[in-house]
């Protein structure tokens, strides 16, 4: 028997998500189902999917239930699992507010990258405490076609390679993932950011996301870019005791990132619920058959 399954559509700087509320974790969402839902022609369409589950109801989040009532079970558009999604967690918080589960102010959200603190401001922007960046040692390089660039390896819970380029167009059409070297640098794949300067503490980026392709924004990517740019500029808040704030333009908008002297990184930007509706479980079963 077919049932109606609720979904919403939301975005943060045009990094867009299918949102599936499922508080008791009753839905089966294998990778193929996620990919079908995120398909832009035959499905609902999104860079990724936010499965909204109570932490106590999800085996990966039970240990965080005392700290955070809700778990962001994030999936990339191809159905793969990622540790963290910075825009996703801001849109996730906006959904919780929209659904009446929380009001503006602070809330904790469980993710595979740990518990994140999110602040829903009165002016509408959503800020997330992203934790600290790790900067693994060792040179990495990314390439697209004939062009190659040295890149900074930054881990924001998920892996990134940040390359400073002369022109964002040099990254090409980004239909295929950029190559990277050495081959073993990212055993689980990598998100690749291309960065140009726009002004003092102001950069612009494009991104090719692991599991989603080129997207119009990536929150963890923007944080990786802010940290890589700060180090390139000779700024290390932990050493100087002074926070470093960068404005990061992405194709879908602007994010503001601050790295504090304790290493904690905060990211602020818009998070929007666009629509809500229902799909028929029979459609999904048909796609998966
Ligand atoms: N768009 C996200 C990142 C999503 C996960 C990424 N594709 C990965 O596989 O690590 C963001 O806003 O951070």
From Swiss-Prot:
CC terms in the record's Gene Ontology section = cytosol
Q: Which reaction does it catalyse?
A: (2S,6S)-2,6-diaminopimelate = meso-2,6-diaminopimelate
Active-site feature positions: 85, 218
Q: Which PROSITE patterns match?
A: DAP_EPIMERASE
**Coiled-coil regions, chain positions:** none
Q: Does the keyword Acetylation apply?
A: no
Q: Which InterPro entries match?
A: DAP_epimerase_AS, DAP_epimerase_DapF
GO terms in the biological process aspect are: lysine biosynthetic process via diaminopimelate
One Pfam annotation reads DAP_epimerase
Q: Which UniProt keywords apply?
A: Amino-acid biosynthesis, Cytoplasm, Isomerase, Lysine biosynthesis
Q: Which GO terms describe its molecular function?
A: diaminopimelate epimerase activity
Site for Could be important to modulate the pK values of the two catalytic cysteine residues, residues: 160, 209
Describe the function of this protein. Catalyzes the stereoinversion of LL-2,6-diaminopimelate (L,L-DAP) to meso-diaminopimelate (meso-DAP), a precursor of L-lysine and an essential component of the bacterial peptidoglycan.
- Family statement drawn from the similarity comment of this UniProt entry: Belongs to the diaminopimelate epimerase family.
What is the designated name of this protein?
Diaminopimelate epimerase
Tell me what organism the protein belongs to: Streptomyces coelicolor (strain ATCC BAA-471 / A3(2) / M145)
Q: What is the lineage of its organism?
A: Bacteria, Bacillati, Actinomycetota, Actinomycetes, Kitasatosporales
Please name the gene that encodes this protein: dapF
């Amino acid at each position: 028997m077919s049932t109606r399954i609720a979904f919403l559509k939301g975005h943060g700087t045009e990094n867009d998500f299918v949102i599936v509320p499922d508080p008791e974790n009753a839905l089966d969402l294998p990778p193929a189902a996620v990919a079908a839902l995120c398909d832009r022609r035959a499905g609902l369409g999104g860079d990724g999917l936010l499965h909204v589950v109570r932490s106590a109801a999800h085996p990966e989040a039970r240990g965080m239930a005392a700290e955070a009532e809700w778990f962001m079970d994030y999936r990339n558009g191809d159905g793969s699992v990622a540790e963290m999604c910075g825009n996703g967690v801001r849109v996730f918080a906006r959904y919780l507010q929209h659904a009446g589960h929380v009001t503006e102010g602070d809330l904790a959200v469980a993710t595979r990258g740990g518990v994140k603190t999110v602040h829903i401001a009165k002016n509408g922007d959503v800020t997330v405490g992203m934790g600290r960046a790790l900067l693994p040692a060792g040179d990495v390089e990314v390439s697209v076609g004939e062009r190659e660039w040295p890149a900074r390896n930054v881990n924001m819970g998920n892996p990134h390679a940040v390359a400073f380029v002369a022109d964002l167009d040099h990254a090409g059409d980004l239909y295929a993932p950029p190559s990277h070297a050495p081959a073993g640098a990212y055993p689980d794949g990598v998100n690749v950011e291309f960065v140009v300067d726009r002004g003092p503490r102001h950069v612009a980026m494009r991104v090719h996301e692991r599991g989603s392709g080129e997207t119009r924004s990536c929150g963890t990517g923007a944080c990786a870019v802010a940290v890589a740019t700060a180090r390139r500029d000779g700024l290390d808040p932990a050493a100087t005791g002074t926070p470093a704030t960068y404005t990061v333009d992405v194709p879908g908008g602007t994010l503001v990132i601050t790295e504090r002297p304790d290493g904690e990184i905060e990211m602020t930007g818009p998070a929007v619920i666009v629509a809500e509706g229902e799909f028929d479980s029979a459609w999904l079963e048909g796609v998966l058959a």
